[in-house]
Structures are given as structure tokens and as C-alpha cells.
Amino acid sequence: AAAYRAGECLYSDYYGEYSDYTRKGGVICSEILLPPHAPLEYQDRATLWNTVEQVEKHKKAQLAYSFDIALQNELSMEENIALAREFVQRCLVDKGMVADFAVHAPDKEDGGIPNPHFHVMTTMRPINPDGTWGQKQRREYVLDDEGNRVLDRNGKPMFNAVPTTDWGSPETLEEWREAWCRMVNEKFAKKGLDVRIDHRSYVRQGIDLIPTVHEGPTVRQMEAKGIRTDKGELNRWIKA
């Protein structure tokens, strides 16, 4: 995933093979931002994600949080990149996360329709002050009314696994969405543009509209060539 987003050739220690996406088009830039106490070698993409994979012991462990954010056609690419970097630094890195982000502008892949966006991959484990990886979860033991640990049928203390950070919570995700919306709209206002975005759904905005479905590059290419698709027809019906 990291190689694809960055358009690079990376070697996986776990799989013992290279992932080569150096021929992938549309990758404008990619960066890794670190919190102050993170080892500087994590600025190397292969080192970072191989280390993340090595620290996990369970073969099905989730390695990273990953999400995409749309950039704005009303802004220049330089402005979009600066805005993306500011968001990643302020909302993610300043909270202790290592963040790997890449800006894409795959015009040709999307049938000529500008679709700038950026991908973000962040670490799930916090980094301790000494630069080592912290725990994803901690044990919170179940206590009785007298403060003693409750035992299960096998005589072992019962506990709940509690996340050590709030990074994966719905509330945090909402904060990120709201922060991005605010940053973009502030930029629009500063440039004197009469346009705004809203991170809320139509339902939350009180708007009686049906959202369009995501078409993707293949559908957009077909539509650009005059080939009508089911998703294209549905979106035309929604917009009518």
C-alpha cells in the first residue's frame, strides 16, 4: 500500500519481495512527517513500514490507519499540497502519529476529469519518549464492589482491552473531517472564492438529496468515451 501511494519501489522484509510502482502516474509528491521523539530513520518509507510490520506479533494485526481526502480544483496544486501538509501535521503528527501521505492528481486515469486527492497512512501505535513503540491497548481489569479483581471460571482475572489512544474512535474521525472542512473553507474565504464545502452528510445538513455513487477511474474513462454505464446512469438520474 505504501509503495502504491508513493509511486515507489519498496522491499518488504515480511514477504521477501519488492513492490514496484515507479511507473505509476499521477503521484505529485509524497512525504513522511514525524513527531519530535520519533527516530529520524523512519523518514525512510521502507524502514518505517518494515519496522511497523516487525513489531506486530499477530499475523492478522492491523498495521496502519488509512484514508483518502479530496483536494480542491479551485486551488492550485501548490496550495493543495500546503493544505494537505498542514492538516497532516496539525491533526495527526502533533497528536503523536507518524504520517505517510501522498498527493495524487490522476487526470488521465479518470478520463480527463480532474480528481486531485491525497492518501494518508498513519501508525497505530504511539511512540514512547525514548523512541520505542508503545502499546495499542492496555488491560483494564474488571473489579467487584470492593475493588478486587473479578476472576473467570478458570480463576484468571477478567479484563477489557482498552485503546491507549483515541485515534481510531468515531469522535476523532469526526474531528478530522471537521478540521479539514474548516481549513479548506478558510482558504476559500482568504482567496475571495464564493464556494464552501461541508463534511456533514445531506441528512445532517437537512438537505433532501440523494448522494451520487462513486464511479471510479474505469467508469469515468468509459463515460468520457461516450460509453454509458450503470453507475453513470444512476448519477445522471440522481442529478436530474
Question: What are these language model-derived features?
Answer:
Residues 1-240:
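N-terminal nicking endonuclease/strand-transfer module with a His-rich metal-binding environment
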